[in-house]
Amino acid sequence: MKIILLGPPGAGKGTQAKLISSEFSIPHISTGDIFRANISGKTELGMKAKGYMDKGLLVPDELTIDIVKDRISKDDCKSGFLLDGFPRTVNQAEALDKFLVGRKEKIDCALLIDVPREKIFNRMTGRRVCSKCGASYHIEYNPTKVEGICDLCGSPVVQRKDDSEDTVKERLDVYDRQTEPLVVYYRNEAVLKSVDGTQDIDKVFEDIRNVLGEI
């Protein structure tokens, strides 16, 4: 089974990806992971990507596509794969489909973990971490016993820069701009499925398993 995983930052994609990978015995392929693997392995594709990244430039679509194509051509992807973080654009989606058609293959499901923007905003901006031991908290779902103080070591808890309101808003704006056209694309391809990501982890996965079991 060949699956594309879609969803906003903070929707729990990483957690569900691990569960899907284990349940269906397919590799979870994160774009970030394969970029890092190519760069650390000093592959030709990795060195090209590093050249752009070192200059603070976005890696071009063509190179990103080549890196993904190389990864899904490996033996462990013969029975399928789960792509997380790719495609990000319709151009990438079309290139992936063209590559798969050439191999007489296709995407079986574009799975959207759907969480309303307001819910994601609250999830992310409410996160806190201990400034010393790194313990994780949330002001609403998992607060410290004493406000602002780590339960484990007594150090102050802080909000990471990535979780500030401005940063989260920008990340969600970027996601909306990039992903809405992808959702339309995969809906038109009749492979889009959606699950309610506001539920607890086990219930979300139960819904995912039911959706994928029907394919």
Swiss-Prot record:
Sequence positions that bind ATP: G10, A11, G12, K13, G14, T15, R127, S136, Y137, Q199
Positions bound to AMP: T31, R36, L57, L58, V59, G85, F86, P87, R88, Q92, R160, R171
Annotated coiled-coil segments of the chain: none
Renumbered residue ranges of the record's region LID: 126-163
Recorded superkingdom: Bacteria
Predominant subcellular localization, coarse grouping: cytoplasm
UniProt region (NMP), positions on chain: 30-59
Pfam families in UniProt: ADK, ADK_lid
Residues that, per the record, bind Zn(2+): C130, C133, C150, C153
Keywords for this protein: ATP-binding, Cytoplasm, Kinase, Metal-binding, Nucleotide biosynthesis, Nucleotide-binding, Transferase, Zinc
InterPro entries for this protein: Adenyl_kin_sub, Adenylat/UMP-CMP_kin, Adenylat_kinase_CS, Adenylate_kinase_lid-dom, P-loop_NTPase
Keyword DNA-binding set for record: no
Gene Ontology MF: a single term: adenylate kinase activity
GO biological processes: AMP salvage
Listed PANTHER family: NUCLEOTIDE KINASE
Record remark on domains: Consists of three domains, a large central CORE domain and two small peripheral domains, NMPbind and LID, which undergo movements during catalysis. The LID domain closes over the site of phosphoryl transfer upon ATP binding. Assembling and dissambling the active center during each catalytic cycle provides an effective means to prevent ATP hydrolysis. Some bacteria have evolved a zinc-coordinating structure that stabilizes the LID domain.
Record's protein name: Adenylate kinase
Species, as recorded: Clostridium acetobutylicum (strain ATCC 824 / DSM 792 / JCM 1419 / IAM 19013 / LMG 5710 / NBRC 13948 / NRRL B-527 / VKM B-1787 / 2291 / W)
